[in-house]
Amino acid sequence: MYYTEESLETLKHSIDIVSVLGEYVHLKRSGADYKACCPFHDEKTPSFIVYPTRGHYHCYGCGEHGDAINFLMKQQGYSFSEAVLFLAKKFHVDLVVRTKETSGQDSKDSLRRINREAERFFQYCLLHLPEGEEALAYLYKRGFSPDTIDRFQIGYAPEQRLFIQAMEERNISVKQLEWAGYLAKDWFLFAQRIMFPIQDALGYTIGFSSRRFKEGGRGGKYINSPETILFKKSRVLYGLQFSRKRIAKERRVILVEGQADCLQMIDFGFNCTLAAQGTSFTETHVHELVKLGVSKAYLLFDGDAAGEKASLRVGDLCQAAGITAIVCRLPSGQDPDSFLMQRGPEELRELLDRGEDYLSFLVWHKIHSYEQFTPREKARVIEEVIQQVRCWGSPITIHEYLRQLASLVKVPEPAVLSYLSSITSAAEDKGKKVSAKEPSSESKQTSTEGKISKKISPRMILEADVIRCLLFAKPEDEFVPATVKQYLSPEEFHCAEYRAIFVMAMNHYNDRQTLPSMDEMMSLVVGTEAMTLLVARRMNTELMRDIVVQSIQKLLDKHWRDKKRKLCHQTGKGLDSLQEYVRLSGERVKVSLVS
């Protein structure tokens, strides 16, 4: 959306940049200005300067600069509109949308106003109406203090007649209430329920979650607002408005199942806690965590079978998205709320610290699903776990997980790696059978080049030795890439994956005089037989120069012999021309020069 220049100027003149940046950076006064260590790069001596009179910041170390809007976009990942809305709310500035976009924006603004008025009315009913006393007593019994109730703006929805009357007094019609999701076929969805506002990351109320606190009444235990133009359940992370700053700073999150659990966790100081809204955690929710910069997720789900099942599912989603999942198991029958009430925050911190990595939890769960863990069951567990692990990030990461798996199930690492190779080969065979009847023109064109033999050939081992040198070469040592570049070309690599790594490495080296990262190169072989061969053997980096010379020598020797054998086969009588002999002899001489 686009705002008028006048309203944006009003906002910019209203912003106190020190109060905004001070929430994220430890500022120290330096004369008329402020300084700090830059949040955008590592440094020990402050070079990040904030100029209050100009409403501007500048880092003289990395060059980052801008105003409060730029800072929020960079530091918090806000879009321009989100940053503007956040600041407008903080400094009480009314923004005006440009005329051509006013219609759609008016709808959102109208819905925000209805939600705001409803939220205020529900709070009033909880604290000041006789009907709210029972709900208030229930909240106190559950451990919600007056400060907690006020902080999270918890309220109580009375019966339908009072609600409609109160809204009409605020110029909100029944038709508008139906549009906003409060009424459905003349039924007030939230009548006589405790109301928990659902807010977006900027603090605007976009919907409600209601809880039945006594027997009777229509609907289930929880009723949530239906989806609207503001409220999309699959994208909402409950508690984000209270946890976003801490999550951005620490890049970790605690995930719980319910809103009450989330609020109690935050109230006890665990200000990086989130819950899903109206549904279980989905891939979309995990994608939102990735956008927030989360690198580690603590799964604190209920201590029952459903909670264990949720940990298995959400943990796999996190791992596949590159987020390290830590499973924290609560005692049987407890949830985070009850655990806090009974044992306190210190014991919960200890429980979080004792959390186990997701792979260990996954293996434990699968092992304990069998009455007897025989060798046959062990093989089945390894295969099932590998099917999940092979989707968890970069090839190097996958290899480390497979090493851990081997340790957990007490089998040699090569055995686990061979399982990965066999699973990958089986998947490839299945895909070939499906498409065998109607091969595409593209497959016909490429069918004769770059195939990896299902039985690893001696030549493939030699090619892998050279590629392994590129993978493990020290960044400061140019001998390895320079030597490989001097003596080898794509022609020497028959394995398509190794040839692709060679081309990537040489192009990168030609452009920047450095090699690509190991992850970049390994991404070309993930899940293939070629990867299995690369990670199956260790590399002595202290002898790297000798190894690369020997590896190139052996590969070129093999290449020369293969070409000679092929020529003999084609002519049926060996070398039949002096020209061919001289050419091959020249290549053989080139090989000798490496020694």
Curated annotation (Swiss-Prot):
Cite the GO molecular-function annotations of the record.
Answer: DNA binding; DNA-directed RNA polymerase activity; zinc ion binding
Q: What's noted about domains in the record? A: Contains an N-terminal zinc-binding domain, a central core domain that contains the primase activity, and a C-terminal DnaB-binding domain.
Check the record and name the Gene3D superfamilies matching this protein.
Answer: 3.40.1360.10, DNA primase, catalytic core, N-terminal domain, Zinc finger, CHC2-type domain
Q: Which GO terms describe its cellular component?
A: cytoplasm; DNA-directed RNA polymerase complex; primosome complex
State the SMART domains in the record.
TOPRIM (SM00493), ZnF_CHCC (SM00400)
* Zn finger spans (CHC2-type): 38-62
Q: Which Enzyme Commission number(s) are on file for it?
A: 2.7.7.101
- What positions does the entry give for Mg(2+) 1 binding? E257, D302
Report what the protein is called.
DNA primase
The GO biological-process annotations, alphabetized, read as: DNA replication, synthesis of primer
Q: How does it assemble?
A: Monomer. Interacts with DnaB.
What phylogenetic lineage does the species belong to? Answer: Bacteria, Pseudomonadati, Chlamydiota, Chlamydiia, Chlamydiales
Which Pfam family would be a valid example here?
DNAG_N
What are the residue boundaries of the Toprim domain, all occurrences included? 251-331
Catalysed reaction per UniProt?
ssDNA + n NTP = ssDNA/pppN(pN)n-1 hybrid + (n-1) diphosphate
Q: Which family does it belong to?
A: Belongs to the DnaG primase family.
Please report the organism this UniProt entry assigns to the protein: Chlamydia trachomatis serovar D (strain ATCC VR-885 / DSM 19411 / UW-3/Cx)
Which cofactors does this protein require? Zn(2+); Mg(2+)
Tell me how the cofactor is bound.
Binds 1 zinc ion per monomer.
